[in-house]
Amino acid sequence: LHTQWPGTGKPRDPFFDQFYASQVQLMVDPVKTQDYAQKALSALLDRIGPAILLTHSQSGTFGFLVADKRPDLVKGVVTVEGGGMPRGFTPVGPPRWFEDAPPPDVTWGITSIPLTYSPTVAEARQLTFVRESMPAPGTLVRCWVQASPARQLPNLQRMPHLLVVGEASAASSTNHCVSRYLTQAGVRNTWVNLGDVGIHGNGHMMMLEKNSLEIAAFLAGWLVDNVEKGRRTTS
């Protein structure tokens, strides 16, 4: 259950109204959005130096793209409730639970603009995706992955990745497919449903919810173990 949102979650509730007032328009073209974000954030890293990337929702793909463009400057990537699948899913309920959403016009796997693959990919149509024959244990969807042999993502292999979803979020049913795509491409990553680590009741906007400090502590602990200590181990 979604129990951590403050207030009623309905209009005229002060928490909801404050949240709603913060919302702004977004660009609906993922190609332009991702291109602008990759260029701007890469330029920022060039100025400030090495960093850990923390992304959420629509910006989830930005972390992958910046890490791909500046692998020497990205020490780790934390993707909270992020997108990035070759194909999405539409919930339909039992017994099928999910159907495939319409395919995107262009996909580079987990992004809408080019990533660095090995062997090299010059055009998105060179990538071939297949649906897994069975859902992963404990899940209800058959993920879309690369046809075998899978091309690798060498730049993303150079840093650890954490993918996090809330227990009560819609992403908890499908977001593991991003992790499976990364794993197939040789990228070390950890996928966590917060409910599985004892953090319960969160939805998509977990950073605004009542237990957000508990979530922040979990993320910080993972970064210490996998970025700070990992760097010491490999140095």
Model segments located where?
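Short beta-strand/loop motif that positions the catalytic acidic residue
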Residues: 157, 163-165
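Catalytic active-site module of serine/aspartate enzymes centered on a nucleophile-bearing elbow/loop
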Residues: 197-235
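Short alpha-helix in the alpha/beta-hydrolase fold that links the catalytic acid
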Residues: 172-182
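A conserved short beta-strand
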Residues: 72-91
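Acidic catalytic loop of the alpha/beta-hydrolase fold
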Residues: 86, 167-173
